[in-house]
Amino acid sequence: MKELEYPFDSGYLLKKKRSIKRQLLSDGSVRIKKKIAVLGGSTTNDIINMLELFLLNYGIEPIFYESEYNRYWQDAVFGNEEIDSFSPDLIFVHTSNRNILKYPAITDSKEQTDALFAEQMKYFETMWEKIAERYHCPVIQNNFEQPYFRLMGNRDAFDCRGRVNFINRLNTAFADYAASHESFYINDINYVSACYGLDKWSESSYWHLYKYAMCVPAIPDFAFNLAAIIKSVFGKNKKALVLDLDNTLWGGVVGDDGVDGIEIGQETHMGQVYAEFQKYLGLVKDTGVMLTVCSKNDEENALAGLNHPEGSLKPDDFIMIKANWDNKDRNIEAIATGLNIGQDALVFLDDNPAERAIVSAQLPTVAVPEMERPEDYIRVVDRSRFFEITAFSSDDLKRNEMYKENAVRAAQQAQFTDYGEYLHSLEMVAVIDDFLPVYLPRITQLTNKSNQFNLTTKRFTTAEMEQVFADDSYIRLYGRLADKFGDNGIVSVVIGKVNSDTLDIDLWLMSCRVLKRDMEYAMLDNLCDRAKQRGLKTVKGYYYPTAKNKMVKELYGDFGFTKVSEDADGNTVWELSLSGYEPKNKYITVERNK
């Protein structure tokens, strides 16, 4: 089909993929059928849909197995009955730089970065060896695209602590593995991702006609990058960031929306954007750049926003906080004086174009980049190369003596043959507690989107959830799970109604992101403990089957409940006596919200 030949129109294919598939399947072609298992470290549905079109066009009719989100390593190393019965003809491991478990820290030694590299390679080699041992089929593995920011600028490419350097080492090691193993192939997304932009950069006519190594329109970008190195060599880097708060570090206005109304964290897509920006700023801080705040806010509200549980930047991360109703240019002058640096060493970040214009007019030596879209904040700051690093010493670390950003990941897993040992190695910590107002939007969202691990599939509106929150006849639990690789956010919700000496579980759900981690046992232990504290004797659970929740059909039975009834539609009722209940959680340390 012409539409699937290079050069193709990506937008057209994405828009018309269903009709194109129908045309291909009805064209009378004879195709070989092949079973392809896709083990994904990110969402793979649209990849599979598009891959199917190209394969059909090549005369291959694919049958796909798609792993659960980010379960690629566990499925490969510990096995999966579904994949075993699927018996794939080929396995594709779709990972990206988002799946690198830990990058070198700016404080790491060469020995530490080498050890981290060895651990990362062991992680993947363990997976590849298990796949080869179990499935005996070809394997296609992505290498890694370049990172979306360079913390040290061009030094990232040759400093062992740089992300660019670390990814390049991994890509070379992946290539060496492929060269020495039959039926193992690299999907070179490092090249493909670069090619998506490199095509314009490397326009061959500029070389053949003028011997330019790049197209003329790219020369300003080249010169800007070169100038960043030169200005760093001669001591002209910026030294401090001056940060607005509302709609800069989080979405919304904390004074109007309240702490529980601002967007930060995993609950919304914009909350994730702001959370990622805060984490990036924390990394910048670790290089010695000073962080300050200049915000039109009551100080109480500003501090409350900075103390939001989903934010990674806290008040202690900032050397100075100017949260008042004075003109921002005056506050920035005070910050420069307080830090004992020139105004030309400051970078002011603010989403408000009026505030940016005033500061630019009143303080012309302060750098004021255009901050239009939150999704672009990291790109704007990083590619402006305000803090290009050409040398790095311990003195740079001392410049900013506040707490460094907490490490989001620790040493990665080595090979495990016992799943229990693997769970222990995760060092999981759960916060399980009664609902908090700040989490009600996320809890409500979970009730309306969780389908697989959801025993009753009961939905709640915001108003209904607020009623549950205010009613003491309910036992309510939210659970958030973190491990040494990061925080999963709120992943489980249980709501039980107290009726006499019995607790009726109206809702039990859990995010599929944490399946097979024993979080359900931690929730059950906590639920039973609270029920006992209220003098209850029995817990009743209900399972209402849907097209998507069959995976939890026997959950209460696995918990030790006794099935007491089942109707013609498959709805079941289960009971558990609290007398003599023994805790079941073995692997998770449980805390209450602090």
Which positions does each model-derived feature cover?
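Acyl-donor binding region in acyl/amide transferases
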Residues: 484, 490-567
